[in-house]
Design a protein with these regions (language model features):
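Residues forming the flavin
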Residues: 1-191
């Protein structure tokens, strides 16, 4: 998941699905923003400084009470133009403006040749523009102890370890290699 870089407050990934993009410290996109959490997080960590900027425009802010909350909390930098926002976040103005114009063309064409994104909302072309400094964060763990249907912990040979029980996120769980948002509710419902 994505967290605000200074406070570690969770920043909803849904904004990327709604049309936000991520740019790195060079002012460039670097990933299909709606990829799986593990892939996007790894790409974000690999960027200079291990952070990126989540970029939205006023049209997105008007439609989202979540973005409005982020603005009120002071998480956002703001600019009346692409160049002003670039200056506010410390990235090259020309590069950032080119990135934004290229993204808007991707939205118009419904095609992202560079990163293969297939989810397009509206262009990010309504001033002012906002950016939140984000980084990868942890809010759920996967993997762990193997249990049976009685929640008894099993050793590496699959045998019950007498008197040892486990439940919730400490167990191997049902998620496999990646977790879908909301799936952890099953853990909470079953195990309390």
């Amino acid at each position: 998941p994505t967290v605000e870089a200074n406070t570690a407050a969770l920043i909803t990934e849904g904004l990327r699905g709604d049309g936000a993009i991520l740019v790195n410290a060079d002012g460039k996109r670097f990933i299909d923003e709606v990829g799986t959490r593990d892939v996007v997080s790894a790409a974000e960590i690999a960027q200079p400084g291990s952070y990126s900027w989540l970029v939205v425009d006023q049209a997105m802010a008007d439609a989202s009470s979540v973005i409005q909350g982020y603005i009120k909390k002071g998480y956002t930098a703001e600019g009346a133009t692409y160049e002003e926002l670039a200056k506010a976040i410390g990235v090259d103005e020309a590069t950032f403006a080119e990135t934004m114009n290229n993204w808007n063309q991707c939205v118009a064409d419904k095609a992202d040749a560079e990163f293969g994104r297939t989810s397009f909302a509206n262009p990010l072309d309504t001033a002012p523009y906002y950016a939140i400094k984000v980084t990868a964060g942890v809010h759920h763990t996967m993997g762990g102890l193997t249990i049976n249907t009685n929640t008894e912990v099993l050793d590496t040979n699959g045998n019950v370890i007498p008197g040892l029980f486990a439940a919730g996120e400490i167990t191997g769980g049902v998620h496999g290699a990646n977790r879908l948002g909301g799936n952890a509710v099953a853990d909470f419902t079953v195990f309390g």
